[in-house]
């Protein structure tokens, strides 16, 4: 069985959906006796250092690299190269991959050079196919939902709204604050997620909150452990995330599995992931409708969330990847 070297970016104190996926995948592949070795690098590693790391990996082994890093690949990798893509970096700011042409071209080159790709949803698979010049094997392996999130008791009398996601423009917190201006019901908002990733954006949000006199209503909790997030779920009425783009939407899926009702953006991937959960899909261009949806949920002393069984575990994720790659990279 070939050794697999998994190159993983680390984001200091930030916990991203991609980080959770990578870490859980490593744990579960090891349980399946896959000889996987971790190569952890800083998220902002430069091109030269990344290639030095790669050059130290035995040429007979296989490389699995997180797609966040592949735009830094400048020369051909001798090893068999496989890429795990949560979503392309060229779509981080806009859902038009051509908005950053240089980033798009570097990712396109890397995706096409890879032996195969792994991604997290069928929607993302269709997105990646647009980057490819020819057919390529793409494995879709949904993220697992940690059991601790499932089947929670929700406080139907709560007036607290929960939002989970790092404080970056793509998550749409500025849109949420604007929508809350027109909410007439009593409310508070808890935001869970690292607010040091984009200090300019965070400072702008704080100014917007002060301008609208919402300081006593909105609390930024920073990054939290899963058990701490579960505690926030139990204290909240519903979940909202007005995200502009997602590869999967792990925090949304976790809160839906817990039993919270959901308000989120009408994106194809979120319709795929959330299935039959009670979700209000909204158009970010219609803030009045968003305000109305928030008012509607706050005014009811009931919760329509469904406590569904986990549809995918991290063990399932690893087994799916193992089956896909058994004759490709592990042997």
Segments (PLM) and residue ranges:
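Conserved acidic donor-binding segment of nucleotide-sugar-dependent glycosyltransferases
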Residues: 279-288, 295-299
